[in-house]
Every structure is written in C-alpha cells, then in structure tokens.
Amino acid sequence: MKLCVTVLSLLVLMAAFCSPALSAPMGSDPPTACCFSYTLRKIPRNFVNDYFETSSLCSQPAVVFQTKKGRQVCANPSEPWVQEYVDDLELN
C-alpha cells in the first residue's frame, strides 16, 4: 500500500512539473506579441533603444519599438519614420 501511494505521489509531482510546451507539437505556440493598433504620433528617436517585428502569424504587420523606460510602442512598418528608425537601429 505504501508503495502505491509513493508511486502515485511521484506521478502526480511529475505531471505537475511537466511543461505543456513539451507535449505540444512544434509550431503550435501562438505568437508572443501582436499589435492591433499603431501609435498615432512619431516617438522621439532618442527614446528608442531597440525594436522587433511582430510575427507573420499576427493579423497585421508591425514594428515594436522598445523605449529606454522599457515601454513597447507599436508602429506601422510602412511609415517612413518607422523605416528610418529601423535602419538606424540596424546600423548601431
């Protein structure tokens, strides 16, 4: 009886610590960041220190700028100022 309780306890603990991502098929995770609207104003270039592009799985393309204060701002990738910031960040 003690053996059954011990084995059952171990199985429950193992199930609790298993990550669901390990059992999911590759590529089934949803995108981590999508933008549903863009900023209406051009943000000052000196506020921005990094950027990334949203996943192609998102409903609309976007560039997400990371500010020095840690905020994320969604921007329209077809805007000239957004392309200029991306080019500048790539060079630096």
Curated annotation (Swiss-Prot):
InterPro entries: Chemokine_b/g/d, Chemokine_CC_CS, Chemokine_IL8-like_dom, Interleukin_8-like_sf. It comes from Bos taurus (Bovine). Belongs to the intercrine beta (chemokine CC) family. GO terms for cellular component: extracellular space. It comes from the Eukaryota. It is found in: Secreted. GO terms for molecular function: CCR chemokine receptor binding; chemokine activity. Its main location: secreted. Disulfide bonds join 34-58, 35-74. PANTHER family: C-C MOTIF CHEMOKINE 4-RELATED, SMALL INDUCIBLE CYTOKINE A. Pfam families: IL8 (PF00048). This is C-C motif chemokine 4. Residues 1-23 form the signal peptide. The keyword Transmembrane helix does not apply. Monokine with inflammatory and chemokinetic properties. One of its GO terms (biological process) is antimicrobial humoral immune response mediated by antimicrobial peptide. Keywords: Chemotaxis, Cytokine, Disulfide bond, Inflammatory response, Secreted, Signal. Homodimer. Interacts with CCR5.
